[in-house]
Amino acid sequence: MANHSSSSSDQGTKKKGFKFRQLPEHAYQGKAKRIKQDLILKAKTKKHFYKNVRPEEYIKKGSGERKRKFSKKSHLQELYERSEEKRRIQQEKEDAKVQKRLEIEKKQKDREQTRNMLSKKTKRGQPIMRNQINHLLAKVKQTS
């Protein structure tokens, strides 16, 4: 129980980590020195390499990067072409719908016209035979 009450009093204060002090000059700093020397060596070798490389090799290296950028452009070009193809197909579908609708309207008008022509009657209520015969002749001509 005593431990439990002491932990509740410790809750108000946070535990602090180890306190670091600055190392004296004579302390061991081998790892840090090795890392620093390694970085210096890498920088020197890079500098030496770029001094000795011919300008032609720079151009070759640069052209390789350009080709890669060009391939990215071709990818974008490919996406653009796909979207254009989709747009073109959609436009063709819309045109086909409009054309079909116009044909349907034309057929309906023709049917209405023939129905009116065939339904005409004389004063006595008899159908006008001239219209009937013309309609039958038109059908025969259409089939042959």
UniProtKB/Swiss-Prot annotation:
Function: Involved in the processing of the 20S pre-rRNA.
InterPro entries, per the entry: Fyv7/TAP26 (IPR013730), Fyv7_fungi (IPR017265)
Pfam families the record matches: rRNA_processing
Keywords: Coiled coil, Nucleus, Ribosome biogenesis, rRNA processing
An individual GO BP term: maturation of SSU-rRNA
Region of interest (Disordered), ranges: 1-33, 62-132
Record localization: Nucleus, Nucleolus
Biased composition regions of type Polar residues, renumbered to the chain: 1-11
Feature: compositional bias, Basic and acidic residues: 75-114
Keyword Nucleus (UniProt): yes
Protein name: rRNA-processing protein fyv7
Residue ranges that the Swiss-Prot or TrEMBL entry lists as coiled coil: 72-124
Family: Belongs to the FYV7 family.
One Gene Ontology cellular component: nucleolus
